[in-house]
Design a protein with these regions (language model features):
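Active-site-proximal N-terminal segment of extracellular/periplasmic enzymes that hydrolyze or transfer
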Residues: 2-54
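Metal-dependent active-site segment of extracytoplasmic phospho-/sulfohydrolases and closely related
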Residues: 23, 45, 224-264
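Catalytic metal-binding/acid-base residues of hydrolase active sites
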Residues: 29, 215, 249-251
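Short, structured active-site-proximal loop/turn typified by the sulfatase FGly-forming signature C/S-X-P-X-R
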Residues: 35-79, 121-123
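Anion (oxyanion) recognition and catalysis
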Residues: 50, 116, 237
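His/Asp/Glu-rich, glycine-adjacent segments
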Residues: 76-216, 275
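Short acidic, glycine/proline-rich loop/turn micro-motifs
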Residues: 214-219, 256
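Single conserved hydrophobic/aromatic residue that forms the stacking wall/gate
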Residues: 268-279
Length: 279
């Protein structure tokens, strides 16, 4: 199929990439994680990207959760346009809290789907399955040009639903624990194999923020994670690719140096002047 020179998604124009365009979303990657790891010599490949490429601090969308920001990356638009306004939604019709991982909540096409419609080969791997359906909306898996699966359910994939049969077996790696750094490593390893075998035009890799919730930038668990990522980044750079590394949101400690909760307390006066609530 002859590829068009550009595609339009949500009133924005994107050129068809001349080499595989890879977007990597490091979930919860506060910039300090990178600064510390680079300062300690743990991320030479990312350091080179910073020095020879473009390095910017970006604002996340509000609310600064995983689902809204991943979909803003995927659509190029804020939640007011794409409709994914949180990780969860209160459904007034049922009175229940619903996870916003269903395509029915998505109001705008993804950039990935527009490139796919234009004839591009599209691949994506997410750590958790909750994002996969949203990010892969509009892709078809019966033409051999799309693969989308999660590390979490890699052993449940099929050609009909994901473009690959049993991704865990295909990759030669067991499905990791959900709450582990290995879940994200599975994503990176899959990206390498997809570049080798599928040769996509567009690829999106999205991790989990288990490590970022568990470790501060100065702790060894975080340093090990970013050193691991940098090794895979070096492997990706051996291909003819253009790489963007970004995050969906940052991460801040919940406690101060004295182990006290880092929260802001406000006194709200309600109808009775002698009563007040702390939040």
């Amino acid at each position: 199929m002859t590829l068009v020179p550009h595609v339009i998604a949500n009133e924005r124009t994107y050129p068809m990439p001349k080499r595989c365009a890879i977007a990597i979303c490091l979930d919860g990657c506060e910039p300090e994680y990178l600064d510390v790891a680079i300062a300690e010599g743990l991320m030479p490949n990312l350091q080179m990207m910073r020095e020879t490429g473009t390095d910017r601090i970006a604002h996340s969308v509000i609310p600064s959760f995983t689902n809204p920001n991943n979909l803003s990356i995927a659509t190029g638009r804020p939640p007011a346009v794409h409709g994914i306004c949180g990780n969860y939604l209160f459904d007034p019709d049922t009175g229940e809290e619903v996870m916003m991982n269903d395509v029915r909540f998505l109001r705008a096409p993804t950039v990935f789907s527009r490139f796919y419609e234009a004839g591009a080969r599209v691949a994506m791997v997410t750590a958790k399955d909750k994002l996969r359906a949203l990010l892969s909306a509009g892709l078809k898996f019966d033409e051999g040009r799309a693969i989308a699966f999660s590390a979490e359910r890699a052993d449940e994939t099929s050609v009909a639903n994901n473009g690959v049969e049993n991704a865990s077996e295909w990759l030669g790696m067991p499905v990791p624990e959900v709450y582990s750094a290995e879940l994200s490593e599975f994503v990176f390893a899959a990206g390498i194999k997809l570049l080798t075998e599928m040769k996509p035009d567009i690829m999106y890799l999205s991790t989990t923020d288990y490590v970022q919730h568990k470790f501060s930038p100065q702790e060894q668990g975080a340093k090990d994670f970013y050193a691991m990522f940098d090794r895979y980044l070096g492997e990706l750079q051996k291909f003819d690719v253009a790489i963007v590394v970004t995050a969906d949101h940052g991460m801040k400690p919940k406690h101060d140096d004295n182990k006290k909760p880092a929260v802001i307390l406000s006194l709200i006066h309600i109808s009775e002047p002698t009563r007040q609530a702390e939040i």
